[in-house]
Structures are given as C-alpha cells and as structure tokens.
Amino acid sequence: MSLTEGLFFKSLYEENKVTLLFLHGGGGAGWMWQPVVDRLTEFHCLVADLPEHGGSMQVKPFSMKLAALKAAELIREQAHGGKAIVIGLSEGAQVAVQMLADYPAVMEKAVISSALLLPMPGASMYSSRGLISALFKMSVPPFRNSDWWIRLNMKHAAGIPDAFYPQFKAGFQEMTESQFVNLMVANQTFRMPEGIEHANVPALIVCGSHEYKAMKDSARSLSSKLKCNQFFQINLGQGSGLANEHNWAMTAPQAFADTIRNWLSGQPLPGVLS
C-alpha cells in the first residue's frame, strides 16, 4: 500500500511491463476492483481511491477535474514509462473521460464503462446542493446502523455482491454530507468535456443493455466524439438488470477481466458484449 501526496493506491504485480490504472465508481473505493484485478495478474495493476473516497478522503472536494488531475499524477509517478491503460467504471469512467480531454498523454488506451454524460430524468434537482443535502439527511444518518437498508442499497442500487458487505457498510457509515453532495453533483452534472475530440487514445466504450436511455445515449455520443474507439453493450443474460450490468466488474468479474485482456491483445471479446 502506498500514499502519495495525492491519491491512496495499491500497486500490484509490479514486475509486469504494462500498467493498468483502475478507477472505481462513486461511493466505493479501490476494493471494488478486487475480483477483476485478481484475474489480471499478468499486468501491473494500480488501484486508486478517488478523491473524497476511502483512503483519499483528505483529497477534496471531489470534482471530475480534480480526480483527473490526481489520476494523471499517479500515472506519471507510478506507471511504467509514465503511461497507463485507464479503466474506469461509472464515476470512474467519467473521470477517465475527463482525462481524455485534459491528460491524454498519460493514457495508452482507455476502457470506459457506463460514463454518464447526458442529463437523467429529474436531473435539474442535482443543481441544488441544498436539495441533495436534504436527501442525504433523509437517507443516510437515520440508517447508518440499519443492515437491511444498507443491504438494500448495496444490492439493488449499487449491484455489489454480498461478499463485499463489510466494505460497503463501512463506506456507508463513514460517508459525510459534503462527500455525498460533492459526488452527486459531480456525477449528475458532468457533460462531454471540451477538447475531447482531440484525444488520440484508443478506447473501448461499454454500457449495459438494461441501463437508462441517458446512459446508452451517453456511450453513443462519446463514441461519436473519439477518433479511435469501439462501442459495445453488455447483456449478462436471463435475469440481468440495470444494477448488475452497470457494476459488471463485480457481478461478472471473469467477463470483465476477459474483456480487458482480449481487447488489449486483439482477440474476440466475450459473448456478453454485442
């Protein structure tokens, strides 16, 4: 484990030449990537905690710009050759998109899974920090010790398997009002960053086939902006839904790892992608 002036991170399998940087979803931390990283032992894996998350709580306030800056600094300092393949999911994918606009020189390639770039229905409320603060006060402090509420959110909102309940519960119990507000505002108001069309970074863009229309349209819009990319939708089969496709790094880690490995080596992608 290491702590730079910026982000807390873990550096695994450092003997391998190619560096992957993993950027997690909002409200979680680097632990979310464990099932995938355990299957990619042939790569040097950097697993970061984003600003105002996990071990990087002191790096704040969270914003896409700040997160992109700190992730780029981490790559320059820790990645082999000062460049990495950046893999982002959900809010981490939004950070990767911001990096494509601001710091493409540190990115060999990018895997962008479910980056929201367009307004969701009712998104206007997220411009009001006061409303989000009220939402926090109603939905978090009264339930900090409520296992059923935490499990409900973990499974149906976040798509996180039961094995990671201790980590999810700890994050829920430690969440602050400012963290919640900053994350929600950043996530829901993020739009296509200026200058991204100039990024000459090969990208794999994915989203779930059961995700919201705004998410699918965001992926298509990003694909239309980038010079060199492939766009796929995820379908995890019968019983699949929004949450488990959105967080497929945890619900289908073998498929996620195989997607990374096969895309980087030019092999056919797993059948869950079409």
Name each model-derived stretch.
Residues A199, I205-C207:
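Short beta-strand/loop motif that positions the catalytic acidic residue
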Residues A101, K109-S139:
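Flexible "cap/lid" loop of the alpha/beta hydrolase fold
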Residues L7-M57:
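Conserved HGGG/HGGXW glycine-rich cap/lid loop of the alpha/beta-hydrolase fold
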Residues L46-I87, N244-M250:
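Active-site loop/oxyanion-hole signature of alpha/beta-hydrolase fold enzymes
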Residues P121-A123, P141-E197:
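Conserved alpha/beta-hydrolase catalytic His-Asp/Glu region
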Residues G88-G92, A96:
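Gly/Ala-rich beta-loop-alpha elbow adjacent to hydrolase catalytic centers
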Residues Y212-S218:
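Conserved alpha/beta-hydrolase "acid-adjacent" motif
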Residues N229-S274:
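Catalytic active-site module of serine/aspartate enzymes centered on a nucleophile-bearing elbow/loop
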